[in-house]
Curated annotation (Swiss-Prot):
Binding site for S-methyl-5'-thioadenosine: E108, N140, G141
Amino-acid positions noted as binding spermidine in the UniProt annotation, renumbered to this chain: H64, D88, D158, S159, T160, D161
Record-linked Pfam families: Spermine_synt_N, Spermine_synth
Superkingdom assignment: Bacteria
UniProt-recorded name of the protein: Polyamine aminopropyltransferase
Annotated function: Catalyzes the irreversible transfer of a propylamine group from the amino donor S-adenosylmethioninamine (decarboxy-AdoMet) to putrescine (1,4-diaminobutane) to yield spermidine.
Catalytic site positions: D158 (proton acceptor)
Gene3D superfamilies in the record: Spermidine synthase, tetramerisation domain, Vaccinia Virus protein VP39
Subunit record text: Homodimer or homotetramer.
GO molecular function: spermidine synthase activity
Catalytic activity entry: S-adenosyl 3-(methylsulfanyl)propylamine + putrescine = S-methyl-5'-thioadenosine + spermidine + H(+)
GO biological process, one term: spermidine biosynthetic process
InterPro entries: PABS, PABS_CS, SAM-dependent_MTases_sf, Spermi_synthase, Spermidine_synt_N, Spermidine_synt_N_sf
Length: 286
C-alpha cells in the first residue's frame, strides 16, 4: 500500500512495517506479480512483490549468504545446483563464487523479474548472469521439478511467501518432486518466512518436509527488512551426517575456498541451527 511518500507492507494483518519513498523507480502489475521498486534513504533500493518486501540493497547479503553457503559447506562436494526462483540474482552471485560448482540451473516463473533486477539491482547478481555454467529456464518451479529428468546435488528454493505464485513452492508435492530431483545425499534448502508471525506456514512446511526427508530442520538469520523476528530457512536431506561435521573441519572447508563474506562464518553457520525453545516446542507439537 502506498500513502503519499510512505509504503506500507501488507504481509500481516495486524502488524507491519513501512518505508519512506524517496523515489519510485518502477511500478507495474503483470499476470504474475504486482511489483514496485523504490529508493529509500536507509535501505537503498527496495523491491516489493504483491505488497511484500523481497529484497533491499542494504541487507540482501545476509539472506543470500546464508541460503547459499550453509548447504554448500555442509555438503562439501556440490557440483550441480538448481535455484527455484531467485530472479534478483543474489543466490546466483553467491553460488558462482564457488568455482568447483559445474552446472547451475535457475527456474524463474517471471523473466521480467530477472530483467528488472539486472537494471535496478546490478550488485545483486554482480555479472553472474553471464556465467557460462548458468542455464535459465522460464517456468513454474513445481512444473519444472515434476517434469525434469535432471539430477542435482543441491536445490535452493528462493521463493516469495506462500501466497499467489509462491504457494506451490511450499506444498508437499513440491518437496516430493524436489526429493526425486536430488542425487543420493542431495540437499534441499528454502526460505520459510519469519517464525514469530508465520508459525502456521512454517509448521506446515515442517510436516511436508518430514514426509520426504530423513533429516529435516530449520536454521535462522536476522534480516532487518524481513519484519517480525528471525528468518527461517528450511533444511532437508537423507544424509544425517552432514550436520555432524565438527567446526574445525568446517573451518578448513571454508578456508580452502579462500572466500570472504559479510555475514557468514563458521560460528554463524553452526549456531544458526540452534533454535529458541519456543520454536522447538512448536515444531515438536506439529
Amino acid at each position: 500500500m502506498i500513502n503519499e511518500k510512505i509504503w506500507h507492507e501488507k504481509l500481516h494483518r495486524h502488524v507491519g512495517q513501512y518505508f519512506s519513498i524517496d523515489k519510485i523507480l518502477y511500478q507495474k502489475k503483470n499476470k504474475y506479480h504486482d511489483i514496485i521498486i523504490f529508493q529509500n534513504s536507509i535501505m537503498g533500493r527496495i523491491m516489493a512483490i504483491d505488497g511484500v518486501v523481497q529484497t533491499t540493497e542494504k541487507d540482501e547479503f545476509i539472506y543470500h549468504e546464508m541460503l547459499t553457503h550453509v548447504p554448500i559447506f555442509y555438503h562439501g562436494l556440490i557440483k550441480n545446483v538448481l535455484i527455484v526462483g531467485g530472479g534478483d540474482g543474489g543466490i546466483l552471485r553467491e553460488i558462482c563464487r564457488h568455482k568447483s560448482i559445474e552446472n547451475i540451473t535457475m527456474v524463474e516463473i517471471d523473466l521480467n523479474i530477472i530483467d528488472l533486477c539486472k537494471q535496478f539491482f546490478p550488485k545483486h547478481n554482480n555479472n553472474a548472469y553471464k556465467d557460462p555454467r548458468l542455464k535459465i529456464v522460464i517456468d513454474n518451479g513445481l512444473n519444472f521439478v515434476q517434469k525434469t529428468k535432471e539430477k542435482f546435488d543441491l536445490i535452493i528454493s528462493d521463493s516469495t511467501d506462500p501466497i499467489g505464485c509462491g504457494k506451490d513452492l511450499f506444498l508437499s508435492d513440491f518437496y516430493f518432486h524436489c526429493k526425486n530431483c536430488l542425487v543420493k545425499n542431495g540437499i534441499f534448502v528454502g526460505q520459510n518466512g519469519v517464525f514469530f508471525l508465520q508459525k502456521n506456514d512454517i509448521n506446515q512446511s515442517y510436516k511436508n518436509l518430514k514426509k520426504n526427508f530423513h533429516d529435516v530442520s530449520f536454521y535462522q538469520a536476522t534480516i532487518p527488512s524481513y519484519y517480525g523476528g528471525t528468518m527461517m530457512f528450511s533444511w532437508g536431506t537423507d544424509n544425517i551426517d552432514f550436520r555432524q561435521i565438527n567446526i574445525k573441519n568446517l573451518e578448513k572447508r571454508i578456508k580452502d575456498k579462500k572466500l570472504t563474506f559479510n555475514y557468514y562464518n563458521s560460528n554463524i553457520h553452526i549456531s544458526s541451527f540452534y533454535l529458541p525453545q519456543y520454536i522447538i516446542n512448536t515444531l515438536d507439537k506439529s
